[in-house]
């Protein structure tokens, strides 16, 4: 588990550095030069024709630093979500395998727990860290030590619930990003409106170009931030749904293929 946590931390740091480099390079070489060129052309056409209505350009909408930051955070969060989705799908693949070898009509007795746990222990070290093997091994070990089926059910449930809590905690950084993106967009709105108010004297004299550009910064940053936030929250909820289903399916797997077949000898039940 410690190696997995270290890998995730290194992945997140590496993904952030990679995204920052790629997005900033794209802005410097593509988005901002094209936005400046389009804006100059629109200003020239407006000077020639007062009735000219400029078209909204994607480059102009995305050009400011607030939008760049929002896109960086979105791509970083998507990388984290993709990593966790891939890990969850690998865990789900174990649900299609028969880890407890049982013949029809055969019951699991406390003294048989060690034998039935061997196929699970034979899994690779990475697979043994998955939820399903941990829940199965915890149930078999508890059954061997307590000879109590209710105790097995409790330990399986506790294992699944603790895993659900861990998954919930590990998504904290993604939730923070989803909260931070609209906030950054509103910072752009405040900056744009503040700049527009500072140029109000130009509008009084008839020059409204500076004011309209500043208001464009305000509205574009909010627009991009809200769109990015909607997309990110959708992906986050899909991941949460996938993880919740994994926990429930693992618990059902243990109930159907392990606990249901357990049996305590009558002498132990009486004692």
What are these regions (language model features)?
Residues 2-9, 13, 25-160, 264-271:
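Large intracellular
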Residues 4, 153, 157, 206-271:
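Channel- or pocket-lining gating/hinge segments that regulate access to a cavity or pore
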Residues 14, 18, 69-82, 184-187, ...:
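Lipid-exposed faces of alpha-helical membrane segments in multi-pass integral membrane proteins
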Residues 19-37, 84, 184-204:
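Juxtamembrane "helix exit" motif at the C-terminal ends of alpha-helical transmembrane segments
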Residues 29, 33, 81-92, 196-199, ...:
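Membrane-spanning helices that line or support transport/gating and their immediate boundary helices
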Residues 70-73, 127, 131, 147, ...:
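Charged, alpha-helix-enriched surfaces in structured cytosolic catalytic cores
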Residues 163:
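Cys/His-clustered metal-coordination modules, chiefly Zn-binding fingers
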């Amino acid at each position: 588990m410690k190696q997995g946590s270290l890998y995730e931390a290194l992945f997140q740091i590496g993904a952030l550095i990679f995204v920052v480099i790629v997005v900033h390079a794209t802005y410097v070489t593509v988005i901002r030069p094209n936005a400046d060129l389009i804006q100059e052309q629109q200003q020239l056409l407006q000077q020639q024709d007062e009735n000219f209505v400029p078209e909204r350009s994607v480059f102009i909408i995305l050009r400011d630093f607030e939008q760049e930051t929002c896109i960086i955070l979105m791509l970083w969060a998507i990388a984290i979500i993709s990593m966790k989705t891939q890990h969850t799908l690998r865990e789900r693949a174990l649900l299609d395998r028969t880890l407890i070898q049982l013949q029809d009509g055969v019951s699991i007795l406390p003294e048989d727990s060690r034998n039935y746990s061997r196929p699970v222990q034979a899994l690779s070290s990475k697979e043994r860290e998955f939820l399903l093997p941990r829940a199965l091994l915890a149930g078999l070990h508890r059954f061997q030590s307590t000879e109590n089926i209710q105790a097995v059910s409790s330990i399986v449930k506790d294992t699944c619930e603790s895993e659900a809590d861990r998954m919930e905690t590990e998504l904290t950084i993604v939730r923070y990003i989803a909260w931070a993106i609209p906030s950054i967009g509103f910072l752009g709105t405040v900056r744009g409106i503040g700049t527009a108010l500072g140029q109000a004297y130009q509008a009084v004299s008839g020059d409204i170009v500076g004011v309209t550009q500043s208001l464009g910064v305000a509205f574009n940053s909010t627009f991009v931030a809200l769109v990015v936030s909607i997309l990110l929250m959708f992906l986050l909820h899909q991941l949460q749904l996938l993880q919740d289903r994994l926990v429930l399916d693992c618990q059902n797997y243990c109930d159907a293929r392990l606990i249901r077949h357990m049996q305590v000898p009558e002498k132990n039940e009486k004692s």
